[in-house]
């Protein structure tokens, strides 16, 4: 039996994370005691990123701006994901609302082939993957437009905060 067992825990809320970590500690400790280990197990928690939970009002405002600029045929809600993202650390620390969005950047043919074969999760590399390689254009232009449109949703004179 190995002397360590690294786990990667991803949850959708801090409350669920606490419940899961407490359960792991309880189960591992009980198993070690039942097996007669000479000492209690050690637990080391590192690289914790909190769940990213968009503020509804902020998201609605930015989404409306995206819909108006890009068209509703080019905007959609991202499905719930268990990605590790440190984006929310700063706004959570400052106590300010935020919204996190994504833009497409995968080669359309690569995406289509993966979707047709039912292999999106394995054939389309996500952010932070060593194989992640978005197409340069129109990804850069779309990302720049998205940032400007989101900023103008708050800063333009016709959109008072």
Pin down the residues of each PLM region.
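Metal-dependent amide/peptide-bond hydrolase catalytic core
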Residues: 1-161
